[in-house]
């Protein structure tokens, strides 16, 4: 089974968590693309979706799935999204696709966070994947200096502007032993919109695509 086939298997497995007549929170990325394709097969059973990126919104709408503004929705039963890394505590690094802020907002609203990944994303300690930070443009250099003080090596993601009009710093060389603590420390830096550590809001269910099939971790 290829990596893409493992992603697809995990994505389709998430359908069993979708409740009839509900609005589904939808993330961003290559694995979520498969989930949107899967969701299209049951689109008549759901009200619609809330999306974390313009890219996902366009794909949902291409299938005729209604996309709601989160401000119009008081509750979401599930949010389905991928991860760049995930540890045994279901803490994640996300934001490789630069949609981390909207992802974090929707995941905060959702009752359950369903994380869909292939088995290459499972790690013991977070940090091999550079940690994305969304930053107000004028604060980029200041935030970078503060991140160096925390032991990281921030790199400006050239040419990338988020859907919110901000920039991304990718922080290399972090071995994140205390994700909850670091998430709070980084978010306390003035000029940071949010960071790609999802520790405070960890995944509730992880569906892992493996060569042997989909494994469910809780």
From Swiss-Prot:
<protein>
    <recommendedName>
        <fullName>Ribose-5-phosphate isomerase A</fullName>
        <ecNumber>5.3.1.6</ecNumber>
    </recommendedName>
</protein>
<dbReference type="InterPro" id="IPR004788">
    <property type="entry name" value="Ribose5P_isomerase_type_A"/>
</dbReference>
<comment type="subunit">
    <text>Homodimer.</text>
</comment>
<comment type="pathway">
    <text>Carbohydrate degradation; pentose phosphate pathway; D-ribose 5-phosphate from D-ribulose 5-phosphate (non-oxidative stage): step 1/1.</text>
</comment>
<dbReference type="GO" id="GO:0004751">
    <property type="term" value="F:ribose-5-phosphate isomerase activity"/>
</dbReference>
<dbReference type="GO" id="GO:0005829">
    <property type="term" value="C:cytosol"/>
</dbReference>
<feature type="binding site">
    <location>
        <begin position="81"/>
        <end position="84"/>
    </location>
    <ligand>
        <name>substrate</name>
    </ligand>
</feature>
<dbReference type="InterPro" id="IPR020672">
    <property type="entry name" value="Ribose5P_isomerase_typA_subgr"/>
</dbReference>
<dbReference type="Pfam" id="PF06026">
    <property type="entry name" value="Rib_5-P_isom_A"/>
</dbReference>
<feature type="binding site">
    <location>
        <begin position="28"/>
        <end position="31"/>
    </location>
    <ligand>
        <name>substrate</name>
    </ligand>
</feature>
<feature type="binding site">
    <location>
        <position position="121"/>
    </location>
    <ligand>
        <name>substrate</name>
    </ligand>
</feature>
<comment type="similarity">
    <text>Belongs to the ribose 5-phosphate isomerase family.</text>
</comment>
<dbReference type="InterPro" id="IPR037171">
    <property type="entry name" value="NagB/RpiA_transferase-like"/>
</dbReference>
<feature type="active site" description="Proton acceptor">
    <location>
        <position position="103"/>
    </location>
</feature>
<dbReference type="GO" id="GO:0009052">
    <property type="term" value="P:pentose-phosphate shunt, non-oxidative branch"/>
</dbReference>
<feature type="binding site">
    <location>
        <begin position="94"/>
        <end position="97"/>
    </location>
    <ligand>
        <name>substrate</name>
    </ligand>
</feature>
<dbReference type="GO" id="GO:0006014">
    <property type="term" value="P:D-ribose metabolic process"/>
</dbReference>
<keyword id="KW-0413">Isomerase</keyword>
<comment type="function">
    <text>Catalyzes the reversible conversion of ribose-5-phosphate to ribulose 5-phosphate.</text>
</comment>
């Amino acid at each position: 089974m290829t990596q893409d086939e493992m992603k697809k298997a995990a994505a389709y497995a998430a359908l069993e968590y979708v409740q009839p007549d509900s609005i589904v929170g939808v993330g961003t990325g290559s694995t979520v693309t498969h989930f949107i394709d899967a969701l299209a097969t049951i689109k008549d059973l759901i009200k619609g979706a809330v999306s974390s990126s313009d890219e996902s919104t366009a794909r949902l709408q291409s299938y005729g799935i209604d996309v709601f503004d989160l401000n119009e929705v008081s509750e979401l039963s599930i949010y389905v999204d991928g991860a760049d890394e995930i540890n045994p505590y279901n803490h994640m690094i996300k934001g490789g696709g630069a949609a981390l802020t909207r992802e974090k907002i929707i995941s905060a609203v959702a009752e359950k966070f369903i994380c869909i990944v292939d088995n290459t994303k499972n790690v013991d300690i977070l940090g091999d994947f550079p940690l994305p930070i969304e930053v107000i443009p004028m604060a980029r250099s200041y935030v970078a200096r503060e991140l160096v003080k925390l032991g990281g090596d921030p790199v400006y993601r050239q040419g990338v502007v988020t859907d919110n009009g901000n920039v991304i710093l990718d922080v290399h060389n972090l071995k994140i032993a205390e994700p909850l603590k670091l998430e709070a420390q980084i978010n306390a830096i003035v000029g940071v919109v949010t960071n790609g550590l999802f520790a405070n809001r960890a995944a509730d269910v992880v569906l892992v695509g493996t060569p042997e099939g989909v494994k469910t971790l809780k």
